[in-house]
From Swiss-Prot:
Lineage: Bacteria, Pseudomonadati, Pseudomonadota, Alphaproteobacteria, Rhodospirillales
tr-type G domain segment(s): 8-283
Protein name as it appears in the record: Elongation factor G
Top-level taxon of the source organism: Bacteria
Signal peptide span: none
Keywords: Cytoplasm, Elongation factor, GTP-binding, Nucleotide-binding, Protein biosynthesis
Organism: Paramagnetospirillum magneticum (strain ATCC 700264 / AMB-1)
A GO MF label: guanosine tetraphosphate binding
Main localization of the protein described in the UniProt heading: cytoplasm
Binding site for GTP: 17-24, 81-85, 135-138
SUPFAM superfamilies listed in its UniProt record: EF-G C-terminal domain-like, P-loop containing nucleoside triphosphate hydrolases, Ribosomal protein S5 domain 2-like, Translation proteins
Function field: Catalyzes the GTP-dependent ribosomal translocation step during translation elongation. During this step, the ribosome changes from the pre-translocational (PRE) to the post-translocational (POST) state as the newly formed A-site-bound peptidyl-tRNA and P-site-bound deacylated tRNA move to the P and E sites, respectively. Catalyzes the coordinated movement of the two tRNA molecules, the mRNA and conformational changes in the ribosome.
Amino acid sequence: MARTTPLERYRNIGIMAHIDAGKTTTTERILYYTGKSYKIGEVHEGTATMDWMEQEQERGITITSAATTAFWRDHRVNIIDTPGHVDFTIEVERSLRVLDGAVTVFDSVAGVEPQSETVWRQADKYGVPRICFVNKMDRIGANFYRCVDMIVDRLGARPLVMHLPIGEESGYIGLVDLLRNVAVIWKDESLGAEFEDQPIPADLVEKAAQYRAQLIETAVEMDDEAMEQYLGGEEPSFEVLQACIRKGTISRTFVPVLCGSAFKNKGVQPLLDAVIDYLPAPVDIPAIKGVKYGTEDEIAKHSTDDEPFAGLAFKIMNDPFVGSLTFVRVYSGVVESGSYIQNTVKEKRERVGRMLLMHANSREEIKEARAGDIVAFAGLKDTTTGDTLCDPTPSSLVVLERMEFPEPVIEVAVEPKSKADQEKMGIALARLAAEDPSFRVTSDVESGQTVIKGMGELHLEILVDRMKREFKVEANVGAPQVAYRETISKAYEVDYTHKKQTGGSGQFARVKIRFEPGEKGAGYVFENKVIGGSVPKEYVPGVDKGIRSAMDNGVIAGFPMIDFKATLTDGAYHDVDSSVLAFEIASRAAFREGIAKAGPKLLEPMMKVEVVTPEDYLGDVIGDLNSRRGQVNDMDQRGNARVITAMVPLANMFGYVNTLRSMSQGRAQYSMTFDHYSEVPQNVSDEIRAKLAG
């Protein structure tokens, strides 16, 4: 089957923004005007086609990125709608990794909001060219020009203004297209499908001329010939200017800024035109880099059907009808349904069952996918997010660069309400963890509890909610906990004899063990220094086993012991009464006695915290970290933001995300990873003991 749409006519784009700026509504309108939806879905009615999970329709927010294909001006546009809530940045990060360009939507009333900054930085990290759409021009307090200023101040970007609004708030009727130098007015009765060109209104003529001159001046920087023509007093042609703007957008020299009101159906068609005119096709961006499987040799995969197949799995979704779906961006080559492919990260062969082209939540079955496509594979068993899929021929094996996923920062215990729920919960959690790499599941050995970890309170709340709805699991959810540890601070030697005589063969074992502090991070070390056979070799493993079984419960508060050394120096045995079990019991008792006298201490997990904050809130952020027993180690500048690195005890980090958001009006963000265990100060240790005893 031949290619139906040439590669240069592909656009793989994401629509990203702060929560509530109108991303999903904008996507809905795009689908409506490109003919994919026959009826417009509204977010506030809970019928938007891109928001297809129940929780999304209820909460009016987008959690997962749904991928959709639409057509406009004979171009194929693959759109990924991404969530704007801070707890779901992982979804945005995944989408940006596989996109070629993005549309950033701003709320014209709020301007550049905190999550817009976060998303913008993520797009910078992946080098994604973008265009800006200033939405909600019909709302009270809408201000297009302030929004443009904020793009400069907060994002450090260079805006290229392409539109000026005509009328504001409820009087918003259309826009001035500066490049074509005309006014575009929408007809309300046609649901925004019809609009017409008119002369620019008299009160805007001067302003439009001024902004148009700026537009041309910025655009011609991209082309020497156009620049000479412009400096010679001649205006370059429309086509030349368009080519200059395209070049500048793709090289990220500037960002075109458009305006409209998606909800009122105005400005969506010019936005679609801009996607096609200015955002890159797969062939316009650098080839994706990877390494040849099993080597360190770097290779590039080009967007062409002629190279062997290579793609990246960027999302796993459970579909109620098809089962597990793996969303894949095909970078090169052709892949057919029913064929075998290699997962080079998991080192497994996979068979592509069915191949689907997704439209939000309906699907179309296809027989093959080619370079540039974003498709869903059904039937993959071992593939998870971030894996490379490629042609199984040995010479074609490649590993594309993986995505980085943040470590979870909050954990809660969950326990099933009944035995039946227990089995279902295991399956549900495994499925959810496969879909979402920022969600982890562990079993706590000490308490036997299942602990789930995620990116924030909303994140875990929604996952527990999905567990209840999709998998029908009833569970109780606990409060967040800290995993403390214990160790010793000085050496102590114990001589302990275990004797038990009850007629017949008894039990006898004598051990002399020296306990001493170990290296940080060394865990538990056991050494046998018995000379002359006072403890026969076959009994020594019993001594080690006894200590190992006792060290799970420390003497202070029953937390596991770490970083100590036990040396067996001497002992005695009895020909008849000694056994491995007797030595195990003796060493266990010696451990309890010795550790209690070796200066036991409580340890707590210390987290390495990195806070990225605008300069204005620097003092407050540092003051707050100090009040949490934190130590600031380093301060750095990143763009127009400050980066603070500090060590803070995990126990003092609960609820930090909310404090930080309110302290910085939501503009600061943080990440936190475990660094090491450190001694708990005496006053805090006493508090913990009292709490556990009480």
